[in-house]
Regions:
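Structured helix-beta-strand junction loops
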Residues: 38, 83, 133-134, 169, ...
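Active-site nucleotide/adenylate-binding loops and adjacent lid/helix of ATP-dependent enzymes
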Residues: 1-14, 42, 56, 97-182
């Protein structure tokens, strides 16, 4: 893959201002290291700087390794499309939909795909009634990644506290029915689905700490 970049001017976009900035910085170190090992000297662009796009003059391809809002949600891709710079990853619409858990689940359900019961939390939501129906639930910011602002709740007081916490990441909050069972992740590279990997944690769920600061 790196050989296919021969003769191209490359930039790696990373950092940004989302809650996942530190994750992006770690990912960028890996990507930049691999490119350097392949004989390339990519332009390194931290998108936290103002008007970062002004640094991309002469760049042919951008590797977008940002995480979270502004980076994964189609915003960066829209800027690059406007500049005529090729970019790794999905297009604007695909990125925006994939970053929005509510819209993603609505699409899956519309396509007839099985997905856990869910609702968008509103001021009128009866937390106790939701838990009576589901038993327990996960509360998530609709447009955040890395499990930031996420909580597993089983009583109305915890539900209310989790909603307040999730809203610090954005107004839209998703409540999703808890399914007790093994968890798997599957990466998609182009049109190829890679082997499924089972996720196991010592306690709780696969939260930010487990993802980036433990042996899970």
């Amino acid at each position: 893959m790196i050989a296919a970049l021969q003769g191209k001017s490359l930039a790696v976009l990373f950092g940004g201002r989302s809650g996942e900035r530190e994750v992006s910085l770690a990912s960028a170190r890996t990507v930049i290291g691999a490119l350097r090992d392949g004989g390339y000297a990519p332009l390194e662009v931290d998108t936290a700087q103002s008007r970062w796009w002004d640094t991309l003059g002469g760049v042919d391809i951008a590797f977008n390794i940002q995480h979270g809002r502004g980076g994964e949600d189609g915003v960066t891709r829209a800027v690059l499309d406007e500049l005529g710079v090729l970019c790794s990853g999905s297009g604007v619409l695909g990125s925006a939909l994939a970053m929005d858990k509510l819209r993603s689940k609505q699409l899956w359900r519309g396509a007839g795909l099985p997905t856990a019961d869910f609702l968008e939390v509103a001021d009128s939501t009866d937390y106790r009634a939701v838990l009576d129906a589901w038993g327990s639930a996960f509360i998530k910011p609709a447009c955040e990644g890395s499990s930031l602002g996420m909580a597993h709740v089983s009583d109305a007081a915890a539900f209310a506290a989790a909603v307040l916490s999730a809203r610090q990441c954005g107004d839209a909050v998703l409540a999703e029915r808890f399914i007790d069972g093994p968890e798997y992740t599957v990466a998609i590279l182009g049109e190829q689905a890679l082997p499924a990997i089972r996720i196991a944690v010592e306690s709780g769920f696969y939260d930010y700490q487990a993802k980036y600061h433990s042996e899970a």
